């Protein structure tokens, strides 16, 4: 029997004997009555236990420190006038394991910075229990959405020889201290993947609808609240699809996942709304209930310039074609102008990746970013370039050796008519849903520069 079972069935269990094992959150002694608060991790809500000097095992129970493990036998008593719907009047207490006095999570407020230093313990706090339970629900919801829509789940390689993003920020995998890659394990330079997209495109040509969901790695020496060296990516790919199909898929998937979390984790969301972000539930409910807007990149530039002309100040006021939009620009568009999630399409080709389809205007590509209030860019994707000559020309522009991607580029030789997909950073989505302000707080054991504690 666990605490979630008691909450789910407390009306039918009233006045009945129950047995529960849990971890002590607090233990307060009084002259006539003592109170112990337990949690076993199965539900965010705690369980209050009432015990008295005549309770069997009272001495053990009264000595139980915070984080100790106890077994409680007792009677479930309804408490409709109190914050919790019921409590347990203990008839027996057994101290199964006593925690040391120096347990770091005592009953007081702890800073996020301190809790990041004890990632192996912080999941025991209510805030992190709420965040990681929502993370679990959202991960399931992603698989649920794609499986119910006839997508094939593809596990793409973690060790790879390609840099899908062309940024060169990869972790090298080697067993050779001399970095002689020709004599290394794979006979060539190998790295941890930055994206499963290229491999996913190959499988989309076989199955039409595929998605990947797995870890990716970036050797980016960044210390911002949005960047981590290891994170998870969702990357669907659809053959015969264009940018409009891609936009619809982004919207459908996001609405489905957020809607599922709202259905399954309202208790956690209410707690996080109180602790982390007032208005959180209304914010994410807006994702489900509103229709997203679409603006072209050049429309966005005009809107930004108009705002500057009327006196608005950005940190970057030099608005020009080729500008890589900053978070301040993205948030202004979706928060102040459109007041809803916004797709921005048709970016300059020279600020986007080599594999994106070139538009007929010769200067833009069929790329799309989704901007959401409170965060800016949430995910991005594109229609893929199907023309062999054009993709070779883009490889040359970016200094990419086409021989290293011969298998990928060669897909265009064997029947290739459109393909589109996008990448969504899972942790960025969880930050948005939970109101967490730092990516380190939505990953169980975060990996960031100079930090590898576990």
Swiss-Prot record:
Signal peptide region: none
One of the protein's GO biological processes: asparaginyl-tRNA aminoacylation
EC nos: 6.1.1.22
SS bond partners: none
InterPro entries noted in UniProt: Aa-tRNA-synt_II, aa-tRNA-synth_II, aa-tRNA-synth_II/BPL/LPL, Asn-tRNA-ligase, Asp/Asn-tRNA-synth_IIb, NA-bd_OB-fold, NA-bd_OB_tRNA
SUPFAM superfamilies, per the entry: Class II aaRS and biotin synthetases, Nucleic acid-binding proteins
Catalysed reaction, written as an equation: tRNA(Asn) + L-asparagine + ATP = L-asparaginyl-tRNA(Asn) + AMP + diphosphate + H(+)
Gene3D superfamilies: Bira Bifunctional Protein, Domain 2, Nucleic acid-binding proteins
Any one annotated GO CC term: cytoplasm
Enzymatic class: ligase
UniProt KW keywords: Aminoacyl-tRNA synthetase, ATP-binding, Cytoplasm, Ligase, Nucleotide-binding, Protein biosynthesis
GO molecular function, one term: ATP binding
Protein localization: Cytoplasm
Pfam families: tRNA-synt_2, tRNA_anti-codon
Oligomeric and partner information: Homodimer.
Family classification: Belongs to the class-II aminoacyl-tRNA synthetase family.
Protein name: Asparagine--tRNA ligase
Lineage, uppermost ranks: Bacteria, Bacillati, Mycoplasmatota, Mollicutes, Entomoplasmatales
């Amino acid at each position: 029997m666990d605490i979630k079972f008691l909450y789910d069935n407390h009306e039918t269990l009233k006045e009945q004997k129950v047995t529960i094992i849990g971890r002590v959150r607090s233990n307060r002694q009084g002259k006539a009555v003592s109170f112990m608060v337990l949690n076993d991790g199965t539900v965010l809500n705690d369980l209050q236990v009432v015990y008295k000097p005549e309770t069997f095992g009272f001495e053990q129970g009264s000595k139980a420190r915070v984080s100790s493990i106890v077994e409680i036998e007792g009677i479930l008593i309804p408490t409709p006038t109190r914050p919790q719907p019921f409590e347990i009047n203990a008839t027996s207490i057994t101290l199964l394991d006593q925690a040391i006095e120096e347990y770091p999570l005592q009953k007081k407020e702890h800073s996020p910075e301190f809790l990041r230093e004890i990632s192996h313990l912080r999941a025991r706090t209510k805030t992190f229990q709420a965040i990681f339970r929502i993370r679990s629900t959202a991960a399931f919801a992603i698989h649920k959405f794609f499986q119910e829509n006839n997508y094939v789940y593809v596990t793409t390689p973690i060790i790879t020889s390609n840099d899908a993003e062309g940024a060169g920020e990869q972790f090298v995998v080697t067993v050779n201290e001399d970095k002689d890659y020709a004599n290394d394990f794979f006979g060539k330079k190998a790295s941890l993947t930055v994206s499963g997209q290229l491999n996913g495109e190959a499988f989309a040509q076989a199955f039409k609808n595929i998605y990947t969901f797995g870890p990716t790695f970036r050797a980016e020496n960044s210390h911002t609240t949005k960047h981590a060296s290891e994170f998870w990516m969702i990357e669907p790919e659809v053959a015969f699809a264009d940018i409009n199909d891609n936009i619809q898929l982004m919207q459908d998937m996001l609405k489905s996942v957020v809607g599922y979390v709202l259905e399954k984790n309202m208790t956690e969301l209410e707690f996080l709304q109180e602790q982390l972000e007032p208005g959180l539930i209304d914010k994410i409910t807006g994702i489900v209930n509103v229709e997203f807007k679409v603006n072209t990149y050049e429309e966005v530039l005009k809107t930004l310039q108009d705002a500057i002309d009327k006196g608005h100040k950005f940190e970057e006021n030099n608005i020009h074609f080729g500008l890589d939009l900053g978070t301040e620009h993205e948030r202004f568009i979706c928060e102040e102008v459109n007041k809803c999630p916004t797709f921005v399409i048709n970016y300059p080709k020279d600020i986007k990746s080599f594999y994106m389809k070139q538009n007929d205007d010769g200067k833009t590509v069929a790329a799309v970013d989704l901007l959401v209030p409170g965060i800016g860019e949430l995910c991005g994707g594109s229609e893929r370039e199907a023309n062999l000559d054009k993709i070779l020309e883009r490889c040359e522009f970016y200094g990419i050796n086409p021989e290293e991607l011969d298998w990928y580029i060669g897909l265009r030789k064997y029947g290739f008519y459109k393909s589109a997909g996008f990448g969504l950073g899972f942790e960025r989505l969880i930050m948005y849903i939970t109101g967490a302000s730092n990516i380190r707080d939505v990953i169980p054991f975060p990996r960031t520069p100079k930090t590898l504690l576990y």
